[in-house]
Design a protein with these regions (language model features):
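Active-site-adjacent substrate/metal-binding segments within catalytic domains
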Residues: 74-101, 105-114, 118-126, 131-134, ...
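C-terminal tail/sorting-segment detector
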Residues: 126, 297-301, 316, 848, ...
């Protein structure tokens, strides 16, 4: 069996200074930690109490919650209920969190922001309901200001109901399954999700940046403010600043608050354009200034890129025709359920990129904000989908009260995510209509929804994932007169007829079957058809619930644990530009148990008799060997479906090997070897050093190996047990076996195809985590993970230093290396100057002098300071020609 560690293909995102220290934090959180000085934004994920059940009076301040379970959020209360007879478990329950008002919050406007609460939540502060949100996938916020206790205890209570009404066709999870934030602002402030950064003119030489900012006045008199926006590049250089004076109308009894919009335009030269291959990010830092005093601030990441949707050319990104090689994906993960840590999402996206995938459809709902951050950084395109079914109640009320709540929910969806360059298209619904023809209510609703979206964001195309119209190509083609792209589920056979009915229509495969039982791949209807801009197969990653009850296996090419299945390489052979060859053992065209399933192909060369062999490849030809015997040569041109079959290959113990040839030269090789009996457990962590931030994750793969360290693929269903101690916790244990309903939140599980998966999360205390793994009759294994202090850098002075002689310097970043415990300090000198750089301890004593009046030429410099055994607030002080200084805080935890 293959045993080399999988190396995921990934791009290097150019976000140098953002590497600093908060491994568990998203890009947005790192930006806010770096820049926000007036606004205070705190993540309040720790210290929640949770209890299932509809408990009367649980919102009351004095309610006794001492017997409730203490947990951190994100949290999914349904994952412990998942079973063979309860594939989509709903739940009802309460969350409560006690807090005192943090320092700096007094006299401010205070809101709580929930990135996601599933489902039908009601929010209470100190016994008073302050908000509610029925559709559980959109983010929302509530004003706490009138109900806060300035001193003493405050109680935030959240009620969730995901049981009363069926609202999902797949596993949704239940509870506060995304982050929660406490935010303090001035009473004249930037509205939450109130910035829209667009790029009306794009070129590498020069680009135009348009920044639209909504300013809220929560006071009863008109307020005049200066809106100052500065554009920074990814290493922290300030590029352009613009100031605009605006007078915001007073709030009234009728309006509650008043909102005015400030539009600013800046021009940047020598631009780095965002694209899938060069995911370069800029950010806009906006300050609200009152009589020369900064009162509020906001930071927005964005990319400079141009999207065009051109008839008979397709999707153009910065003028380059781009096909969406896509997958559909639900929001859950094993074994965490709907509460997915960022590290696990990162691992998934990187594996999808390695398959040649370039696009993710967020079927069928918005996902977490940090997921889009990762796509921005890694260059993954996103088809962002709002909802499933609208008000279709067949099989359940999938979107309760859609007609009443859609304007608020759709606006929240678009406004929150509109600045992500990875998002190239909005979908306003999935399979919202059915039938052989396009029904009138579909076109009527699209005529309302599409302009509504365009009023918020004019820069992206709008589509819907349409399954109706199987005998109505003209009706489908006419949708292009309403929406920008005709999105189609399982309609690739009609693309030509639709195009004939409307030659200006652009088509996107929003959902396609993955394998079609050996028929010509759906990708073939896309790759050479300019009016079809891409497709999205169902699905990229296995998911819980839907489909399993009908007896079919999940259809992802990555399994529950993000391990690759054989047909991962089938997709890779279609999508990737790199040479691919991969061996599978079995019949590639066996009747699949459902439309969406794929035949199981073994990756074991422990067989008997004669076997069918499959090779997936994009090479010209493949030469197959069993040991030293050449079985033969096959040519890809002879297989219209790209499934190269080798029937009746005689099994011999040893090695089966496939060599992919291009232009007569060996381009790729794959082999599988005969393995022995299970002998040991082998631990394969993706990292051994974690940040002690309560968020960082080690993704631990545990293999069942033979005595020679080879994975035993077929015959290893041994029960794997583990222990964990130290400064961390397990988030559960999973395998890829969809028929195994052992609890995910457990300390043991049967292996499947020789593997289990254990995500391990750090806590907030530096130290070590010891993991022991065993299986009856096998040699045990162990692992020690190290958790190190997290480092957060915050600028006290935002402007670079310039002294009277014109010398200029800037201390703009500190980056922690968790392996060496060194903090790399970077600074820049614009003209030759004498530089001093020192580190001041919390006591006020200088503990290190990194540069002492050192004369340095113009340029960028870096040095390192070892933070071993350091905890507290340290100050980096940069002096220029012994006069002025720039200071930066470094918090070591």
């Amino acid at each position: 069996m293959r045993h080399s560690k999988i190396n995921s293909a990934s791009k290097i995102s150019v976000i140098i200074f953002l590497i600093a220290g908060i491994a568990g934090a998203s890009l947005t959180e790192r930006l806010e930690g770096r820049f926000l000085k007036s606004r205070i934004k705190l993540r309040i994920d720790e210290g929640w109490k949770v209890q299932s059940g509809n408990i009367p009076g649980a919102q009351a301040t004095g309610f006794n919650d001492s017997s409730w379970t203490t947990t951190n959020v994100p949290h999914d209360m349904s994952i412990t209920l998942y079973s063979a007879t309860n594939l989509d478990p709903g739940a009802i329950g309460w969350y409560r969190r006690h807090f005192t008002l943090p320092a700096g919050f007094a006299g401010k406007k205070v809101i709580v922001q929930f990135d996601g609460v599933y489902h039908d939540s009601k929010i209470y502060l100190n016994g008073t309901q302050v908000g509610n949100q029925q559709y559980g996938y959109v983010s929302f916020y509530c004003d706490l200001t009138p109900y806060l206790n300035a001193t003493g205890d405050n109680v935030l209570a959240v009620f969730v109901d995901n049981e009363t009404v069926r609202n999902s066709r797949w596993y949704s999870g239940t509870g506060i399954f995304r982050h929660v934030w406490l935010i303090a602002t001035d009473f004249v402030y930037v509205r939450n999700w109130g910035t829209a950064v667009t790029t009306p003119a794009v070129a590498a030489a020069q680009s135009q940046i348009r920044v639209q900012t909504d300013i809220v006045n929560d006071l009863t008199t008109a307020q005049t403010r200066t809106v100052q926006t500065t554009i920074y590049d990814s290493i922290g250089n300030a590029l352009q600043t613009v100031d605009t004076t605006i007078t915001v109308k007073p709030k009234t009894i009728d309006t509650v608050m008043s909102i005015d919009t400030c539009v600013q335009t800046l021009v940047l030269s020598s631009c780095n354009l965002w694209s899938p291959s060069t995911p370069y990010l800029y950010y806009a830092y906006t300050r609200i200034i009152n009589n020369a005093t900064p009162a509020d601030d906001y930071v927005t990441q964005f990319g400079i890129r141009q999207l065009q949707y051109v008839a008979n050319q397709g999707l153009l990104i910065n003028g380059v025709a781009t096909k969406m090689k896509g997958i559909c994906m639900h929001h859950m993960a094993v074994p965490t359920g709907a509460a997915v840590p960022e590290r696990m999402s990162e691992r998934t996206i990187k594996e999808l990129l390695a398959s040649g995938c370039t696009s993710i459809r967020t079927s069928h709902n918005p996902v977490s904000p940090e997921f889009y951050d990762l796509c921005d950084q890694l260059g993954m395109l996103v088809l962002d989908e709002w909802c499933d079914k609208w008000y279709d109640t067949s099989g359940g009320a999938f979107y309760e009260n859609w007609a009443q709540t859609w304007p608020k929910d759709l606006a929240s969806f678009i406004e929150r995510d509109r600045n992500h360059p990875s998002i190239v298209m909005w979908s306003v619904g999935n399979e919202v209509a059915s039938g052989a023809t396009v029904p009138p209510y579909l076109t009527t609703n699209l005529q309302i929804l599409v302009p509504y979206v365009k009023n918020i964001d004019k820069t992206r195309a709008v589509t819907n994932a349409c399954v109706a119209g199987s005998s109505d190509p003209a009706g489908l083609g006419a949708l292009a007169n309403i929406e920008d792209i005709v999105g189609l589920n399982y309609k690739e056979a009609q693309y030509g007829a639709i195009h004939s009915s409307n030659p200006n229509a652009l088509i996107l495969g929003t959902e396609q079957a993955p394998y079609l039982n050996g028929a010509v791949p759906t990708w073939f209807a896309v790759r050479n058809t300019p009016y079809v801009i891409g497709h999205h197969i169902w699905v990229g990653v296995d998911f819980l619930a839907e489909g399993i009850s009908s007896g079919g296996p999940p259809s992802g090419y990555l399994d529950y644990c993000i391990f690759r299945k054989a047909w991962f390489y089938y997709q890779q052979s279609q999508w990737s530009d790199s040479p691919v060859v991969h061996i599978g053992i079995g019949n590639a065209v066996d009747p699949a148990p459902s439309t969406w399933a794929t035949p199981f192909l073994s990756e074991s060369w422990n067989q008997s008799g004669s076997v069918n062999v499959v090779t997936y490849t994009n090479c010209d030809s493949v030469i197959l060997y069993v040991n030293a015997t050449k079985i033969g040569t096959e040519y890809l041109n002879n297989f219209s479906n790209m499934i190269m079959q080798w029937p009746n290959v005689q099994y011999q113990s040893g090695v089966i090997k496939a060599i992919g040839m291009k232009s007569g030269i060996q381009a790729a090789v794959d082999s599988i070897m005969t393995v022995g009996k299970p002998a040991k457990v082998f631990l394969k962590p993706d990292r051994t050093t974690l940040y002690a931030d309560g968020e960082d994750i080690c993704c631990l793969e545990v293999d069942i190996d033979d005595a020679n360290d080879n994975l035993v693929f077929n015959d290893s269903t041994d029960t794997v047990q583990f222990t964990l101690s130290g400064q961390g916790r397990s988030l559960g244990i999973g395998s890829a076996d969809y028929t195994n309903f052992e609890p995910f939140k457990a300390m043991s599980r049967k292996a499947y195809n020789g593997r289990v998966f254990i995500p391990i999360q750090s806590d907030t205390v530096p130290g070590t985590i010891t993991v022991g793994v065993s299986s009856p009759g096998l040699t045990s294994g162990s692992l020690i993970l190290t958790t190190v202090p997290q480092v957060i850098t915050t600028a006290i002075r935002s402007a670079p230093l310039r002294n009277t002689q014109g010398s200029r310097a800037d201390l703009f970043t500190c980056v922690c290396n968790p392996d060496s415990k060194n903090i790399q300090v970077r600074y820049r000198v614009d003209v030759p100057s004498a530089i001093s750089l020192s580190v001041i301890a919390p006591s006020g004593r200088m503990v290190n002098c990194l540069a002492n009046n050192k004369y340095q030429a113009a340029g960028a410099y870096s040095t390192e300071w070892n933070a071993m055994n350091r905890i507290g607030v340290y100050l980096f002080v940069l002096k220029i020609n012994n006069t002025k200084m720039v200071r930066k805080i470094c918090i070591v935890r």
